[in-house]
Amino acid sequence: MLNIHDILGNDDENLLSYQCKHITKDKLTLPSHDFVDKVFGLSDRNNRVLRSLQTMFSHGRLANSGYLSILPVDQGIEHSAGASFAINPIYFDPENIVKLAIESGCSAVASTYGTLSLLSRKYAHKIPFMLKLNHNELLSYPTKYHQIFFTQVEAAYSMGAVAVGATVYFGSETSNEEIVAVSNAFAKARSLGLATVLWCYLRNPAFVANGVDYHTAADLTGQADHLGATLGADIVKQKLPTCQGGFKAINFGKTDERVYSELSSNHPIDLCRYQVLNSYCGKVGLINSGGPSGKNDFTEAARTAVINKRAGGMGLILGRKAFQRPLSEGIQLLNLVQDIYLDPNITIA
């Protein structure tokens, strides 16, 4: 078993001992073994949605912990198949995607219609399926950013999936139509008993100002999470925040100085906690993404997991860091992340 203290290195004390003083943990609904009963059992979700949610929370190495570890592989569309899989060509074969999720003990596997439909009869009863409904295909020229539907909610129901996922590019020129399309799709999904997960991403060239990329600012991503929760998502997926003050730097929208002085700080756990706060104080689970693969994947994945867990988040949805390496290493990396959520010594800040 890898040692978390060695992996975090110089960040060890800063991340593992920090205590949030702005938004304290008692103000949040935190992940727990009875989260579905405690939160969604009081909602308008029908019994089949509750069963679908509980199926994910009861599967894999994190079963009955209240946390989720999801393997997402839609990068063949979002980043092109060559760019995603050339480093590890076995994943051009979609069966290896599902095998990685199963062998690493993930809570669910999220992928495209082509991948999951091809394998559903063999695997839908062995690991929870999450069908990603829309994508930004990368073959248009010039490159544009517009989430379009590749399949329908009914396909998820037919293949035995327990959840659907979708993306909205909040802040983009097409965000309004994406919001309407996703709202309609999620309503249909709920009627069929499927859980809903929203990738709440920001996309606008104006969000890069004075050399700073505010696509990952806590105030902007927090508002995106809040919009996702408002759309009725059961879980929101968001990038880990890296900065603060997007509204002020870009000089748009509305904010309040207390967001920066009383509700957050520059500490990474406080920045992530502001995302949790916007996710209905944790009642809509926040899962953070793992980001691209690089030289320090184990350290970065561990760091993201510690920040998410200690902030009050619900888990990680980590793809490229896992599948852009040999299968055994991908399993080891995913298990490292899962071990952090299972470790009772890594507590809520």
UniProtKB/Swiss-Prot annotation:
Catalytic activity: beta-D-fructose 1,6-bisphosphate = D-glyceraldehyde 3-phosphate + dihydroxyacetone phosphate
Superkingdom, taxonomy of origin: Bacteria
Pfam families in UniProt: DeoC
Keyword terms, alphabetized: Cytoplasm, Glycolysis, Lyase, Schiff base
Active site: 237 (schiff-base intermediate with dihydroxyacetone-p)
Coiled coil: none
E.C. code: 4.1.2.13
A single cellular component GO annotation: cytoplasm
Subcellular location: Cytoplasm
Gene3D superfamilies to which the protein is assigned, alphabetical: Aldolase class I
UniProt GO MF annotations: fructose-bisphosphate aldolase activity
GO BP term, pick one: glycolytic process
Main location per the UniProt record: cytoplasm
NCBIfam families according to UniProt: PRK09250.1-2, PRK09250.1-4
Similarity-based family: Belongs to the DeoC/FbaB aldolase family. FbaB subfamily.
Protein name stated in the entry: Probable fructose-bisphosphate aldolase class 1
